[in-house]
């Protein structure tokens, strides 16, 4: 067990009637806030989930006027893009999103789950769900729409090391090239919602990415407003505008190109039903690597050592025209560290 001695700091603030003011407590003003060699928060399977506690209060006239306390974790999230060329002279290039937490490359395994809406979930049930997912060696959960989970939801994810990426807008309500492409119509209200979500949730270490929308895209005005808002409120996490796109970007959303490649996809059928093995071999040929697939369905990818044990050709050169494809080094690209990251940022 680790223990940090309590740190107490005080800052005088003048606030007029009806006035709003942002008050910052920084290590430049308070050196004791600079913690050396802190106990870190890690994803499930990569280390401990150390959490620390903070109490904030605003005192006026010798009495507490407002107060808030919460747990937080200390961790660093970096991202990269794994670039791979596949297929002979006219090689196609695929990019897979890579996450590093506290310098460790994380093999993301998980799926989608939505917090129940308008249902009264007990705290015990929420914690039990998180615990069962952690025991299944899951470490990343994503939302498909714009959920507003309870604090208990995120506290359970913080406790069990479940990473989460948070989606701002509703899936398939703003499809480029259709009558819904300008939804939502009230962009100011949409941005207020984004700001509220970020301010409410951003202290949770389990959140590793902010995502604009799942599988579709907002129009250019809302796209830029959202991007600017995220940048102004959080510089510690990557922002991904969409998890996947299936339309003509040049014709319909050329503004998306400044954020490509996103490194995520769910191109093609999500494979929720049973199919003969030949179907999956053909699917890999059609859409190539899909190194970071945000929606997959039933199949799952084993760990690196397991792949090497039951696929003897797993270290052969990747080639879509080979009779053993995809039972070659493509199998290992999902799980093995690569020096070919074309992007790595904090």
Q: Which residues are covered by each model-predicted region?
A:
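Secreted/periplasmic carbohydrate-active enzymes, especially glycoside hydrolases
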Residues: 1-144, 148, 159-160
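Compositionally biased regions
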Residues: 15, 278-279, 339
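Substrate-binding/catalytic cleft of secreted carbohydrate-active enzymes
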Residues: 140-332
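Conserved small/polar residues in nucleotide/adenosyl-binding loops
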Residues: 334-341
């Amino acid at each position: 067990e680790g223990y940090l001695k309590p740190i107490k700091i005080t800052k005088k603030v003048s606030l007029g009637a009806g006035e709003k003011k942002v008050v910052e407590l920084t290590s430049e003003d308070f050196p004791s806030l600079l913690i050396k060699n802190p106990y870190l928060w890690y994803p499930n399977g990569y280390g401990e989930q150390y959490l620390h506690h903070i109490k904030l209060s605003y005192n006026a006239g010798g009495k507490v006027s407002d107060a808030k306390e919460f747990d937080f974790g200390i961790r660093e999230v970096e991202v990269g893009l794994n670039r791979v060329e596949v297929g002979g002279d006219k090689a196609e290039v695929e990019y897979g999103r890579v996450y590093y937490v506290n310098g460790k490359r994380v093999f993301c395994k998980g799926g989608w789950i939505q917090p129940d809406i308008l249902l009264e979930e007990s705290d015990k049930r929420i914690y039990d769900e998180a615990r069962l997912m952690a025991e299944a060696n899951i470490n990343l959960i994503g939302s498909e729409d714009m959920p507003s989970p309870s604090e208990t939801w995120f506290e359970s994810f913080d406790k069990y090391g479940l990473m989460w990426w948070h989606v701002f807008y509703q899936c398939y309500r703003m499809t480029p090239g259709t009558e819904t492409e300008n939804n939502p119509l009230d962009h100011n209200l949409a941005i207020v919602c984004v700001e509220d979500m970020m301010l409410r949730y951003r202290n949770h270490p389990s959140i590793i990415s902010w995502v604009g929308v799942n599988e579709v895209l907002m129009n250019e005005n809302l796209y830029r407003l959202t991007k600017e808002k995220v940048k102004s409120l959080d510089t510690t996490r990557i922002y991904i505008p969409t998890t996947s796109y299936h339309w003509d970007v040049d014709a319909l959303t050329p503004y998306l190109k400044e954020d490509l490649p996103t490194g995520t996809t769910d191109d093609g059928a999500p494979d929720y039903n049973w199919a003969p093995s030949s179907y999956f071999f053909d699917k890999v040929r059609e859409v190539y690597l899909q190194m970071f697939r945000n929606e997959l369905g039933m199949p799952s990818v084993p760990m690196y050592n397991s792949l090497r044990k039951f696929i003897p050709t797993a270290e052969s050169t990747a080639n879509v025209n080979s009779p053993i494809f995809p039972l070659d080094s493509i199998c290992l690209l999902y799980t093995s560290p690569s020096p070919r990251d074309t992007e790595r940022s904090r």
